[in-house]
Amino acid sequence: YKDGPLALGMHKRGSFYDIVTVKDCQIVDSDFCKILDTVLQFYQNQGAKYYHKLSHIGYLRHLLVRKAVKTEEILIDLVTTTQTEYCGGEEEIQLAELVSHLQNLELKGKIAGILHTQNDSLADVVQNDHTDILSGQDYFFEELLGLKFRISPFSFFQTNSLGAEVLYDTARSYVGNTKDKVIFDLYSGTGTIAQMLA
């Protein structure tokens, strides 16, 4: 809660400021819960301060976790400010320890990369002022209907790959034969629909 203990999870219903720690959420992948819990416990033990939206003081801002359904690759991105005096210790040492904790987790998926993004924007958005790769790579792969996509942490891509496959397959059935036809991919985000039809 606002001005309360360190929390990591979702916004409290009806509140822009309050965050509620979500443990064992039934609608997300269990790997997400393990990663969230590990990061939260690590920074609670360090005494790190979260970024206060009104005073603009603090270190921890967001935790971005993405996982591919088909490849099971996971990308983790810790988003902080550059206010390292609030991280509870030596930032470089802490980040190395956090990477070690995350890499030692027993997960169903495989961690493709662990990133650290700095964001000093006053807005409550996950903005990329600078990103360091702490481990692995700064992307992961997902597959849709036989095509392989390289996904970066801030790219728009369907979060429900299985649902996207059903949607795209349905769209493909409506369009019919596309051989020797030109397809204009207008207003469709990353262009996955046109790639499926090509």
Positions of the model-derived regions?
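Accessory RNA-recognition modules of RNA-modification enzymes
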Residues: Y1-A198
